[in-house]
Amino acid sequence: MTRLLLALILVVSAASAQAAVRIKDIADIKGLRENQIVGYGLVIGLNGTGDTLRNAPFTEQSLQSMLENMGINVRNETTSTTNPARPTTLRTRNVAAVMVTADLQPSIGAGERMDVTVSSLGDATSLLGGTLVMTSLRAADGAVYAVAQGAVTVAGYSVGGQAQNVSQGTPTAGRILNGALVEREVQGSLHEMEFLVLELKNPDFVTATRILDAINRYAGGRYRAQIAFERDYRTIVLSKPRHIGPVRFLAEIGELTVEPDTPARVVINERTGTVVIGRDVRISTVAVTHGNLTVRVTEMPVVSQPAPFSRGQTVVVPQTVVEANEAGSQVAILSGVDLQRLVRGLNQIGLKPSGIIAILQAIKTAGALQADVIVQ
């Protein structure tokens, strides 16, 4: 049985001691975002760890097309007018088909370089030592924005023989540092925007109000005007002053600090046993007990042998032993004035992670947990 691990992360700090954060760390500028680009290519130079061409026909077709584009004939000669040329069956394990992905940063210029991620498509066992040949990277609009090429860096490894294989990490995926050359800039500029819009990464009414007040308080002394107004609890619109550039303006606004408000929330991951409890979680007075019932089933078959020369047959008699054990449990009174008391009360019962998850869900069902419970 797989043991359930517990990672109980407590966000415990007084409201007065909550750290202030910069606006640029909790809000994004609308219109300035990354764009995903992707391309299909080949990694060559593998030491026998590439695709099996019989199992990955797309790799063979790509290799033939690449060689033909370079002027290398990889087709059989035509024997007659009725027998057209057919592709030669290639036999190599040094090539792997890959998908190349990258994030195109906003305002990046043509000629700059960026990192790319290379992931195997076929049955290659490792990309270690391989080199990606020139691959075009396209965005959702179909245009080519970058070209990638270079040696692949792989963190994992995979070695083995016919009877055993040892691997660590993921050797079928890697990265190429500065492996892509940007060929086209993303359209858009801050100078063309009449209004600058801030979008909160974690939308909240209180946080949006605090950001709005901080910006207008700063702008009242710096620009002698109120420049910010809220559109909703996620969006804040800024009116840029005329005598200052957008870069300097956003730099000044981004350095302002506020105290973001965090909602009362409990996040539960049943697969890993992780429980994350927010600082503002409250619980009404409730009594909790949790029983632990363990049932063990053991099969102990008995073989019955016949007597010598009796012409009997050997018979396997099934024998099952069932044991049930119910451990005693304690009753704890949980009165959650704060998170520390809640955790202290749960620890008094001596629960495992699965028990804590079950109790939190039951308390929420009873209406005593004053927080949102998110189960992943």
From Swiss-Prot:
Cellular location(s): Periplasm; Bacterial flagellum basal body
Claim: Signal is one of the keywords in the record: yes
Q: Which residues form a coiled coil?
A: none
Q: Which GO terms describe its molecular function?
A: structural molecule activity
A biological process from GO: bacterial-type flagellum-dependent cell motility
Describe the function of this protein. Answer: Assembles around the rod to form the L-ring and probably protects the motor/basal body from shearing forces during rotation.
This chain's protein is named Flagellar P-ring protein 2
Q: Which species does the entry assign this protein to? A: Bradyrhizobium diazoefficiens (strain JCM 10833 / BCRC 13528 / IAM 13628 / NBRC 14792 / USDA 110)
Q: What gene is it encoded by?
A: flgI2
